[in-house]
Protein backbone atom coordinates (compact mmCIF):
# COMPACT_ATOMS: atom_id res chain seq x y z
CA UNK A 1 0.00 0.00 0.00
CA UNK A 2 1.42 3.36 -1.02
CA UNK A 3 1.83 6.01 1.61
CA UNK A 4 0.19 9.38 0.99
CA UNK A 5 1.61 12.52 2.52
CA UNK A 6 -0.30 15.78 2.57
CA UNK A 7 1.30 19.18 2.32
CA UNK A 8 -0.43 22.59 2.30
CA UNK A 9 0.91 25.95 1.19
CA UNK A 10 -0.61 29.33 0.43
CA UNK A 11 0.00 30.94 -2.96
CA UNK A 12 0.64 34.65 -3.50
CA UNK A 13 -3.06 35.06 -4.34
CA UNK A 14 -4.01 33.56 -0.95
CA UNK A 15 -5.32 30.28 -2.38
CA UNK A 16 -4.48 27.22 -0.33
CA UNK A 17 -2.64 24.67 -2.45
CA UNK A 18 -2.69 21.10 -1.21
CA UNK A 19 -0.64 18.31 -2.61
CA UNK A 20 -1.19 14.67 -1.83
CA UNK A 21 1.79 12.57 -2.85
CA UNK A 22 0.83 9.44 -4.66
CA UNK A 23 -2.65 10.70 -5.53
CA UNK A 24 -2.79 13.24 -8.40
CA UNK A 25 -6.53 12.63 -8.79
CA UNK A 26 -7.15 13.57 -5.14
CA UNK A 27 -5.05 16.72 -5.58
CA UNK A 28 -7.13 17.84 -8.57
CA UNK A 29 -10.35 17.14 -6.67
CA UNK A 30 -9.28 19.15 -3.60
CA UNK A 31 -8.08 22.04 -5.77
CA UNK A 32 -11.34 22.12 -7.76
CA UNK A 33 -13.48 22.10 -4.58
CA UNK A 34 -11.44 24.91 -3.00
CA UNK A 35 -11.88 26.91 -6.21
CA UNK A 36 -15.62 26.14 -6.31
CA UNK A 37 -16.13 27.33 -2.72
CA UNK A 38 -14.16 30.52 -3.36
CA UNK A 39 -16.11 31.16 -6.57
CA UNK A 40 -19.48 30.66 -4.87
CA UNK A 41 -18.46 32.90 -1.95
CA UNK A 42 -17.53 35.64 -4.43
CA UNK A 43 -20.82 35.31 -6.31
CA UNK A 44 -22.67 35.52 -2.98
CA UNK A 45 -20.68 38.61 -1.95
CA UNK A 46 -21.43 40.19 -5.34
CA UNK A 47 -25.14 39.30 -4.96
CA UNK A 48 -25.26 41.13 -1.60
CA UNK A 49 -23.32 44.10 -3.01
CA UNK A 50 -25.76 44.38 -5.95
CA UNK A 51 -28.72 44.02 -3.56
CA UNK A 52 -27.45 46.75 -1.22
CA UNK A 53 -26.83 49.04 -4.22
CA UNK A 54 -30.34 48.42 -5.61
CA UNK A 55 -28.93 46.82 -8.79
CA UNK A 56 -31.63 44.31 -9.74
CA UNK A 57 -29.86 43.15 -12.93
CA UNK A 58 -26.76 42.20 -10.92
CA UNK A 59 -28.85 40.26 -8.40
CA UNK A 60 -30.86 38.37 -11.01
CA UNK A 61 -27.79 37.52 -13.11
CA UNK A 62 -26.79 34.98 -10.44
CA UNK A 63 -29.89 32.82 -11.12
CA UNK A 64 -30.22 30.04 -13.69
CA UNK A 65 -32.95 30.50 -16.29
CA UNK A 66 -35.03 27.77 -14.59
CA UNK A 67 -34.17 28.67 -10.97
CA UNK A 68 -36.66 28.49 -8.12
CA UNK A 69 -36.75 31.11 -5.36
CA UNK A 70 -38.33 30.02 -2.05
CA UNK A 71 -39.01 33.05 0.17
CA UNK A 72 -40.74 32.70 3.54
CA UNK A 73 -44.51 33.19 3.73
CA UNK A 74 -44.84 33.10 -0.06
CA UNK A 75 -45.32 30.51 -2.77
CA UNK A 76 -42.32 29.36 -4.81
CA UNK A 77 -41.21 31.69 -7.59
CA UNK A 78 -40.14 29.79 -10.74
CA UNK A 79 -37.80 31.12 -13.44
CA UNK A 80 -35.31 33.99 -13.66
CA UNK A 81 -37.82 36.52 -15.02
CA UNK A 82 -40.42 35.69 -12.35
CA UNK A 83 -37.67 36.05 -9.72
CA UNK A 84 -36.82 39.45 -11.24
CA UNK A 85 -40.45 40.59 -10.89
CA UNK A 86 -40.69 39.25 -7.33
CA UNK A 87 -37.42 40.86 -6.16
CA UNK A 88 -38.22 44.21 -7.75
CA UNK A 89 -40.68 45.02 -4.93
CA UNK A 90 -38.42 44.49 -1.86
CA UNK A 91 -35.43 45.95 -3.67
CA UNK A 92 -37.47 49.09 -4.30
CA UNK A 93 -38.18 49.40 -0.57
CA UNK A 94 -34.52 49.89 0.33
CA UNK A 95 -33.89 46.66 2.19
CA UNK A 96 -30.25 47.26 2.98
CA UNK A 97 -27.18 46.20 4.84
CA UNK A 98 -27.70 42.62 3.68
CA UNK A 99 -24.76 40.43 4.62
CA UNK A 100 -24.24 36.68 4.43
CA UNK A 101 -22.11 34.48 6.65
CA UNK A 102 -21.33 31.18 4.95
CA UNK A 103 -21.33 28.16 7.27
CA UNK A 104 -20.18 25.76 4.57
CA UNK A 105 -20.17 25.03 0.85
CA UNK A 106 -20.19 21.45 -0.44
CA UNK A 107 -19.93 20.18 -4.00
CA UNK A 108 -20.84 16.98 -5.79
CA UNK A 109 -20.03 17.13 -9.50
CA UNK A 110 -21.90 19.99 -11.24
CA UNK A 111 -24.02 20.72 -8.13
CA UNK A 112 -22.98 22.64 -5.01
CA UNK A 113 -24.88 23.81 -1.96
CA UNK A 114 -24.22 26.76 0.28
CA UNK A 115 -25.62 26.98 3.83
CA UNK A 116 -25.33 29.96 6.13
CA UNK A 117 -26.95 32.89 7.85
CA UNK A 118 -27.92 36.39 6.83
CA UNK A 119 -28.73 39.71 8.45
CA UNK A 120 -30.36 42.80 6.96
CA UNK A 121 -32.11 46.05 7.81
CA UNK A 122 -35.70 46.64 6.66
CA UNK A 123 -37.13 50.19 6.66
CA UNK A 124 -40.62 50.42 8.17
CA UNK A 125 -43.48 52.68 7.04
CA UNK A 126 -43.11 54.80 10.21
CA UNK A 127 -39.48 55.63 9.34
CA UNK A 128 -37.91 53.20 11.79
CA UNK A 129 -35.73 50.30 10.76
CA UNK A 130 -36.20 46.65 11.63
CA UNK A 131 -33.29 44.24 11.87
CA UNK A 132 -33.81 40.76 10.48
CA UNK A 133 -31.63 37.70 10.70
CA UNK A 134 -32.08 34.15 9.54
CA UNK A 135 -30.68 31.25 7.58
CA UNK A 136 -30.44 30.27 3.94
CA UNK A 137 -29.78 27.30 1.70
CA UNK A 138 -28.68 27.89 -1.88
CA UNK A 139 -28.25 25.17 -4.49
CA UNK A 140 -25.85 25.99 -7.31
CA UNK A 141 -25.53 24.34 -10.71
CA UNK A 142 -22.48 24.60 -12.95
CA UNK A 143 -23.53 25.69 -16.44
CA UNK A 144 -20.48 25.61 -18.69
CA UNK A 145 -17.83 27.42 -16.64
CA UNK A 146 -20.33 29.45 -14.57
CA UNK A 147 -21.99 28.63 -11.26
CA UNK A 148 -25.63 29.77 -11.18
CA UNK A 149 -28.27 29.61 -8.47
CA UNK A 150 -30.68 26.75 -9.21
CA UNK A 151 -32.66 27.02 -5.95
CA UNK A 152 -32.55 29.68 -3.26
CA UNK A 153 -34.41 29.37 0.07
CA UNK A 154 -34.28 31.48 3.20
CA UNK A 155 -36.25 32.11 6.36
CA UNK A 156 -36.11 34.55 9.22
CA UNK A 157 -35.22 33.51 12.74
CA UNK A 158 -37.65 36.17 13.99
CA UNK A 159 -41.39 35.56 14.42
CA UNK A 160 -43.60 36.95 11.62
CA UNK A 161 -45.02 40.43 12.22
CA UNK A 162 -48.70 40.53 13.13
Describe the function of each predicted region:
Residues 50-51, 90, 139:
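Histidine kinase transmitter module recognition
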Residues 105-112, 141-146:
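A short, structured loop/turn motif at beta-sheet edges
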Residues 125-127, 159-162:
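A short, polar/proline- and glycine-enriched secondary-structure boundary/capping micro-motif
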Residues 2-65, 81, 160-162:
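Short, low-complexity N-terminal intrinsically disordered segments enriched in polar/charged residues
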Residues 36-39, 43, 56-108, 117, ...:
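A solvent-exposed, acidic/Ser-Thr-rich amphipathic alpha-helical stretch
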Residues 44, 63, 114, 138-140, ...:
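Polar/charged side chains located within well-ordered beta-strands of beta-rich proteins
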Residues 133-160:
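Short beta-strand edge/turn micro-motifs at domain boundaries
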Amino acid sequence: MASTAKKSSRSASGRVNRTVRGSPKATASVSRKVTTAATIRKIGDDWARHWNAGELDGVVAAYAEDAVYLPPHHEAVHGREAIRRYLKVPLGHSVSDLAFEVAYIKQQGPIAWDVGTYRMTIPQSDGTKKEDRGKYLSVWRRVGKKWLLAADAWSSDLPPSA
